[in-house]
Amino acid sequence: MNNQYNWNLEVLLNGKSLADNFTELKQLSEQEKALYDGGACFQTKAKFTEFLQLQEKIEVLENRYSNFLSNKHAENSLDKTINDALFQYEMFKSEHALVFVDFEKNLFKHEKVIRAYLQDPALKQYQRDFELVWRNKKHQIDPASQKLLAQISPAWNQADKIFNVLSTADLNLQPVVYKGKTYVINAVSDYQSLLENKDRGLREAAYKVWLEIYWPTRNTLSVSLVENYIQLETFAKLKKHPNYIAKTAFDDEIDVAFIDFVYEQVASFAPTFKAFQSLRKQIYKHVLKLDKAQPWDLSVPLFKASGDYTIEQAQTDALKILAPMGSEYLEVVKEAFRERWISWLPDKNKYTGAYSISNVKGLDHYFILMNFDKTRASLNTLVHELGHSVHSWYASKYQTQNLDPTIFYAEIASICNELLLCYHDIINYENRNPQQLIRSLMEQISHFFGATTRQLMFSQFEQDTLKLIQQNQKPDFKTLVEIYGKTAIKYQAANADAITKKLKQTKYQKSLAYITSIPHFYAGNFYVYKYAIGQVVGTLVGKKLSAGDSNMLAAYKRFLSSGSTLPPLETIKLLGIDLTQPEPWQEAHAELKRWIKLVQTAFKQLQHKKR
């Protein structure tokens, strides 16, 4: 791979070998154990300060080492040297945890004296870290149970491991046969490629085979998912929480009722979702010259640009699109390009998605992995991931602790950049190029509903399934599909009677079987509803920044710079947005409706043009 288009991960090793970094990490770890000495480090302020400073040194080294390993693994999942190093690192972490099994107990025991130490301005930066531990005081597990849990931790998440095999190696990836030609399928994404093909017959054939992917393993996947939820419920109760969702809400420093509030706000988008789906089908019917748009027609790219889109073009366009962020922000983006923060190109055994790294304390390169496909879609991916990386840059510049944003609001920075791309397109294409305006807005509207309506349907499915488990029921595949199917009534304005009838049909059940294969459900964190938060806030911020709102720009820089130093909803309030009130949700909904009207106008222009 051309070094120009590959990331410079070697900077993470500080000029040393991988083995030398691991040796240093183990040596520092031994020093940490000796200094900790069963809680002796809390007995004097001097020892306490020395312990914190050593922990920081270890954290920085560990961030560098673990990021190097995880990124090299993403670069080539079959690299034996890296896989061996990852295994050794995981074993080291597990053994290390046993020494600190009573760490929280000692923090609670020495809370009064630690609070006194933290009055020193030099130590004030650590205050939030300790407060987050102390608020868990009533949820602590006794030391004996904690030690037992640490010892059996390798046996945890067996349902997750079974799911990973079922959803990868054991997937029913059947070839697509069409007009005597066999299309070999190596990954689920291969079906998507065929669904984007110009040949409608091939698309239909691919769609029908795609429906069968999860059908043979539907019952096993269902058992795996339910057992995963039972484990999560059990661990939550072990920590004296009412249930798994309540535990996640506690960890996020929110009232559990806020989750239901989000459900109701997104449910109010349902009529707009239904109207957009109708408009979308009309557009596909017109552009593709169809009698009726079918499910296998709706993935075909509309109005694709001709010719290859280059990485250099993407870099130039990204700088134009992100101009409303100001000169400092743009300089960071230029640094990302110049200092090779980005792994650009697809490669054999490379992770197929895109991400920006986390655990960034002590780093000065905030790496991005992507798979540039020579289309403008990669520009959207680029600005999205740059949003995360520049967020890391700002947090690192202004905070010494609590740098990484929580998943609760992490997507705001990336969605905001996507919106700047959308508004850039509106300015360039409105009343000039209806085809490209439709393409851009259709993508953005679909992303909006994907992050709100679709993710809330997933989240509602999780909540409803967990309620049955809390009632000592074990839902089977049929029950899970019924739960998911009925979420369309609330979030997509689907007809209740029609859904009830369709749920009795095998074909419809097959189309919903993927609900048992969502990896997010195994994360151990009830979080998919949070995508709606990122989308709604990102929309409001992006709209104002695009319009040149200097007050919002200043607020946005404060938001980026805050890291995770505040509770999540308080962090979002730095933007002047209170998500516990309906107004922000209504404002985002109004903007969504404005986009749809722009699409309707452009579609009329397109129809008039072709007469």
UniProtKB/Swiss-Prot annotation:
Gene3D superfamilies from the UniProt entry: Oligoendopeptidase f, C-terminal domain, Oligopeptidase f, N-terminal domain
EC number: 3.4.24.-
Disulfide bonds: none
Cofactor note: Binds 1 zinc ion.
GO MF annotation terms: metal ion binding; metalloendopeptidase activity
Active site: 385
NCBIfam families per record: pepF
Family: Belongs to the peptidase M3B family.
Descriptive protein name: Oligoendopeptidase F homolog
Organism of this sequence: Mycoplasma pneumoniae (strain ATCC 29342 / M129 / Subtype 1) (Mycoplasmoides pneumoniae)
